[in-house]
Amino acid sequence: MILGTRGSALAIAQADLVTKMLEEKGHELTRNVIKTSGDVFTDRPLHEVAGVGVFVRELDDRMIEGEVDIAVHSMKDLPTVRPPELAIAAVLKRDSPYDVLLTADGSTLDELPDGAIIGTTSMRRRAQLLRYRPDLNVEDLRGNINTRIQKLKAGQYDGILLAEAGLQRMGWDMDVQRLPAEAFCPSANQGTIVVVTRADDEAERACSVLNHERSRMETEVERLLITDVEGGCIVPIGSFAQMNEDGDEIHVLVEVLAVDGTREIRIEDDIPVKNYREHALSIGRMLVEMGGKELVQEAVCEMSGCDDE
């Protein structure tokens, strides 16, 4: 089987993990490294790279064309609407879903001075950061995880926001501050690796044994919560679901923010595992009724520079 992956250090680390798991099951794999739009256009913010799925589209196309059999992704990059020819064969056990702050001098978010420069590649993190500390200067930060950290060390930023899972997968033990989900609700599926194959394919059957059912349920809930507001992973939307220890309820938190963090529409609730899909979709509809879709459209318009008429 041919496994397709992006070429960044983090993507390769994730592909290595899946390769090892499949080889332990007796499967033989070769690798095809593919550049995506998100990798090529690193000189501009993500929202300026056309459309959603900027890290996924090319791999989807290669798989549909039969050039690769398996693709490994950070699940947060996977668009909500997927090609019908493709299947989510496995959701791996989730790593940390949280954001972390890495600063040049070890300062926490509350300790940073007024006007400190914070770098992030995410409009969600930007909006949440400005909501929490409107005095900070938040600037765009592109590049792979190594490049971002080098820019911090070079003094271009006082701090940077990253996904904790990325640091963990790289095997880096750094002095970071984990940011609470209550203030920094993660992107849907953050910290989760997903394995995609063609539907009803031999590769799907081979990869299905890697599936972690609890993680699959939590990530499905997070995607259902934001299905109706749309917008993709580039707009300021957070969606987080976490099953309790008894396994009978899922705590959910979903929010849509204005780009500058001054407004939010937010719902937090506990839903029963029984009929969880219906409950998650109901909360998603409620988010729309409260004005969530309009706030998403406003954010998209602001980021794309369209005029109000």
Swiss-Prot record:
Cofactor(s) of this protein: dipyrromethane
EC number(s) reported in the record = 2.5.1.61
**Where in the chain are disulfide-linked cysteines found?**
none
Q: Which reaction does it catalyse?
A: 4 porphobilinogen + H2O = hydroxymethylbilane + 4 NH4(+)
Q: List, alphabetically, the SUPFAM superfamilies matched.
A: Periplasmic binding protein-like II, Porphobilinogen deaminase (hydroxymethylbilane synthase), C-terminal domain
Pfam families per UniProt: Porphobil_deam, Porphobil_deamC
Question: What molecular function does GO assign, one term?
Answer: hydroxymethylbilane synthase activity
Pathway listed for it is: Porphyrin-containing compound metabolism; protoporphyrin-IX biosynthesis; coproporphyrinogen-III from 5-aminolevulinate: step 2/4
Q: Which GO terms describe its cellular component?
A: cytoplasm
Cross-referenced PANTHER family, in alphabetical order?
PORPHOBILINOGEN DEAMINASE (PTHR11557:SF0)
**What family name appears in the similarity comment?**
Belongs to the HMBS family.
* Name of the featured protein: Probable porphobilinogen deaminase
Q: Which organism is it from?
A: Methanococcoides burtonii (strain DSM 6242 / NBRC 107633 / OCM 468 / ACE-M)
**What is this organism's lineage?**
Archaea, Methanobacteriati, Methanobacteriota, Stenosarchaea group, Methanomicrobia
Gene transcribed to yield this protein: hemC
